[in-house]
Structures are given as C-alpha cells and as structure tokens.
C-alpha cells in the first residue's frame, strides 16, 4: 500500500474531530487526496453497528460489545481503509484498534491482549503509520462534554473511574509504541495542537515520498 494511515485517539471530549478537520484542510492544500472516516460508523454497515454499541438502550455484555466493534472494524478496513490506501490517499480516522484496547480492555475490564489480538485479526494486521493521542485530564474532558451536549452515548455516560482507566490505557499504549504515537496535550490551544500534528505528519509523508 502506498497511502498514509493516520488515526486520532483519546478520551471523549478531547477535540479529535476538530483536529481531524484542521489536518484535512492542510493536507488538501498540499495536494493530497484525504479520506476522513471513523470507527464505529465509517461504512453503511458500520452506521448500524454504531447505533447498537453507542445508542442502544439496555445492557450489552462487554464481550459482545468488543465483538461488535471488531465486526465494524473488519468491514470498514476491507471496504473503506484499504482501498483508499491502495490508491495512495491519506486516511484520517477517528478511533481505531487502540480505542478498543482502551475502552473494552481497560474500561470494561477485559483482557487487553485478547482485545488487541481480536482487533488485529479483524483488520488483517493493519496498523496506522501515525497515531495522534490527544490527552486530557478526564475531569477537564467531562467539563467540555457537559458544555457541548445535553445527551450522551453509552460510553460518554460512563462514570469517572471508567474514563480514568481509559485515559491511563491510552497513555500506556503510547509509551509501549513511541515510534507510532504522537502524544499531545489536548489542553493546549487548538492551533498549537494542529501545528504539532502537521509537523509530524509532514515528516511521515515526506519519508514515504522519498522511500
């Protein structure tokens, strides 16, 4: 594959959508084809799965939830991500397998290694070239969410201890793979964050162009 795969990760309320939009604008100005997508919900099937995992009323068993995310990932990678990469596009994706490890692994207290293995199997081993982790204290993130919304999905509505486990899991993943992750303080001004991300993306894309 000749494209570049960039994912944005972090807890709820950290500004992933904002940074994705800013990065897309910059990349398109540089002449790149950019595909912006998300998990769950980056395909027609994924939209249906998203409704179940985020908005269905009532309990979903943690293992069933993990499998639903994996099903979405398998279809999404096969039908959206890989075709875009194969034609040389830059794929900007809101959440990927690291979210499964953090939310279903740490948040739902499932085995993180099993969740990662399941995700890699679903994605046929596809890892991002760059993962941007927007890190923010969960209390500050909650203030942002409360200011922005009146309704919350099933994960956003979880308690503070759930979100703290998720945050620490993300930081652990970044520490384990520093070559793949860029960790940015999501409390910084958005233009400062965008500049950090652009600098790393520029190096990555330039290296690919010269390879």
Swiss-Prot record:
One of its GO terms (molecular function) is dTMP kinase activity. The keyword Transport does not apply. It comes from the Bacteria. It holds the Pfam family Thymidylate_kin. GO terms for cellular component: cytosol. The keyword Cell division does not apply. CDD domains: TMPK. GO terms for biological process: dTDP biosynthetic process; dTTP biosynthetic process; dUDP biosynthetic process. Its EC number is 2.7.4.9. Keywords: ATP-binding, Kinase, Nucleotide biosynthesis, Nucleotide-binding, Transferase. It catalyses: dTMP + ATP = dTDP + ADP. ATP binds at residues 10-17. Belongs to the thymidylate kinase family. This is Thymidylate kinase. It comes from Clavibacter sepedonicus (Clavibacter michiganensis subsp. sepedonicus). The lineage of its organism: Bacteria, Bacillati, Actinomycetota, Actinomycetes, Micrococcales. The gene is tmk.
């Amino acid at each position: 594959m000749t494209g570049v795969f960039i994912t944005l990760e972090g807890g709820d309320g950290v500004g992933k959508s904002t940074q994705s939009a800013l990065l897309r604008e910059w990349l398109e100005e540089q002449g790149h084809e950019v595909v912006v997508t998300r998990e769950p919900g980056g395909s027609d099937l994924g939209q249906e799965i998203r409704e179940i995992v985020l908005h269905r009323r009532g309990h979903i068993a943690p293992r069933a939830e993990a499998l639903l995310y994996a099903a979405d990932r398998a279809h999404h990678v096969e039908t959206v991500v890989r075709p875009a990469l194969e034609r040389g596009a830059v794929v900007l994706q809101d959440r990927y397998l690291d979210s499964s490890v953090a939310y279903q692994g740490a948040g739902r207290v499932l085995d993180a290694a099993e969740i990662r293995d399941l995700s890699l199997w679903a994605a046929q081993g596809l890892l991002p070239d760059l993962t941007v982790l927007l890190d923010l204290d969960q209390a500050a993130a909650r203030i942002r969410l409360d200011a922005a919304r009146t309704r919350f999905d099933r994960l956003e509505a979880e308690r503070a201890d759930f979100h703290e486990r998720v945050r620490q899991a993300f930081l652990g993943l970044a520490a384990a793979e520093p070559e793949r992750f860029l960790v940015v303080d999501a409390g910084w001004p958005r233009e400062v964050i965008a500049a950090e991300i652009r600098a790393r993306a520029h190096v990555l894309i330039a290296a690919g162009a010269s390879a």
